[in-house]
Amino acid sequence: MMKTSSTQEIKFVPKGWGFEKWIVNNKEYCGKLLYFVKGKRCSWHYHKSKDEVFYVQSGKIQVFYDDNDEIYNNGILVAKSIILSSGDNFHVYRGLRHQMLAIEDTELFEFSTQHFDSDSYRIQKGD
């Protein structure tokens, strides 16, 4: 016999860079749809517990990442970066500092372990 479950309410979270739609967040996994407005960026941050993969549905986004806290040193970019387009994905392991900057309006999916607000350690504020 097939198990069924009730649908969950999708949580809408406005952000300075766009918004998140939380499709699911439970003890097993988390799935979100993220929308970034062109020219906007999230904070430079990391997670001690969360492991996440981003999949770009549409648009173009630059991901900055590094194991160190500094993204810039004396105005010079010291973090690594990659530009992702539709169909690309990027894995953010626990502890990896990261930030996303939308080159175009961008829609992406986040697949991760469970999300806890207390597990976001912001180093530099975003939009």
Predicted features by range, described:
Residues 49-71:
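Glycine- and acidic-residue-biased ligand/ion/polar-headgroup-sensing regions
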Residues 9-50, 57:
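A short glycine-rich, His/Asp/Glu-containing loop-to-beta-strand
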Residues 3-4, 8-9, 13-14, 69-73, ...:
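Double-stranded beta-helix
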